[in-house]
Amino acid sequence: MDVAKEKELREAEALMEKNVLLTSIDKVLNWGRGHSFWPVTFGLACCAIEMMAAGGPRVDISRFGYEVFRASPRHADVMIVAGTCTRKMAPLLRMIYDQMPEPKWVIAMGSCASAGGPFADSYSMLTGVDKIVPVDVYIPGCPPRPESLVYGLLQLQHKVNHPDKVRLLKHGK
């Protein structure tokens, strides 16, 4: 009787190995998050024009699942800071970031958002939005091409899908 039960159990395990996908729930959630970013619109200067062009038919970021730009930060999980950020705009940037639900990511698009750009020496400019919010991906250029934004989104997707290979920092700390 025990031999028959063991044989039946082995057959069930073999069948399960062929037909059942075993994974952790985090991997499944990260896969879903990485393939359906919902960016909040936060265009500040000329980089915002390139961000809008990325949604057009020539580049078409919707083929990657990123076409849903949200007007409300409560419905977004990615903030794309596109352009020059002044010191007066910094508290609003932080407020919008704080309104986004976890998990959330930030992309600094362009030289101005990354390091201040040509206005870095100005009294009213931030020398990078990473002084206000934690930035996950930097996209260089003045302004960067729409293809660069697609590349940055794909880098963020890789970062989300492989948190064990890429160190993700906990936001807000």
From Swiss-Prot:
Work out whether the entry's keyword set contains Membrane: yes
Task: Please give an example of a GO cellular component term from this record.
Answer: plasma membrane
Top EC class, one word: translocase
Q: Name one Pfam family in it.
A: Oxidored_q6
What molecular functions are annotated in GO for this chain? 4 iron, 4 sulfur cluster binding; iron ion binding; NADH dehydrogenase (ubiquinone) activity; NADH:ubiquinone reductase (non-electrogenic) activity; quinone binding
Q: Which domain of life is it from?
A: Bacteria
Q: How is the cofactor bound?
A: Binds 1 [4Fe-4S] cluster.
Membrane topology label: Peripheral membrane protein
Is rRNA-binding included in the keywords of this UniProt record? Answer: no
Keywords of this entry: 4Fe-4S, Cell membrane, Iron, Iron-sulfur, Membrane, Metal-binding, NAD, Quinone, Translocase, Transport
Q: Main localisation, per the record?
A: membrane
Q: Which GO terms describe its biological process?
A: aerobic respiration; electron transport coupled proton transport
Needed cofactors: [4Fe-4S] cluster
Subcellular localization is given as: Cell membrane
Binding annotation for [4Fe-4S] cluster:
46-47, 112, 142
What subunit structure does UniProt give?
NDH-1 is composed of 14 different subunits. Subunits NuoB, C, D, E, F, and G constitute the peripheral sector of the complex.
Family to which this protein belongs: Belongs to the complex I 20 kDa subunit family.
In terms of NCBIfam families, this protein maps to: nuoB_fam, PRK06411.1
Role of this protein: NDH-1 shuttles electrons from NADH, via FMN and iron-sulfur (Fe-S) centers, to quinones in the respiratory chain. The immediate electron acceptor for the enzyme in this species is believed to be a menaquinone. Couples the redox reaction to proton translocation (for every two electrons transferred, four hydrogen ions are translocated across the cytoplasmic membrane), and thus conserves the redox energy in a proton gradient.
Please state what the protein is called.
NADH-quinone oxidoreductase subunit B
Q: Which organism is it from?
A: Desulfitobacterium hafniense (strain Y51)
